[in-house]
Amino acid sequence: MEQDPDLLFFGGDQNYHHTEHTVGWIEFGMHFRDIFRDRPNICIPDDHDVGHGNVWGESGKNATLPGSADGGYKFPVKYVNQVQRQQSWHLPDCPHPTPVNRDISVYFTRITVGGVDFAVLEDRKFKSGPAGK
């Protein structure tokens, strides 16, 4: 390995298997297994991980327009929560895990690596879609 990072950060789009997240997640892990073994990593989901080309979470509402332009999620809550759980299970617990609409879980935390404190924040879940409110 040419690079020897102290920390890995994956900010989304780890997975493009829009209807079979677990398959894509295992595939992602297999690609990076050698570097995951001995260093901390931060991994958070983004639009493609939850089956969207773009996602404006609109605080968890159900998307109804083509392309989800009204905001929200087109896949079931169970799927959205599964994706987040699979990708963030290894990070410290969220200090205030109050879910958004439809009981979609939220995720934010902090992690300290090498004396540096990192805030891990998600934002896509709270954005409004381009069709507006």
Where are each of the predicted segments found?
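Metal-dependent phosphoester/phosphodiester hydrolase catalytic core
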Residues: 1-133
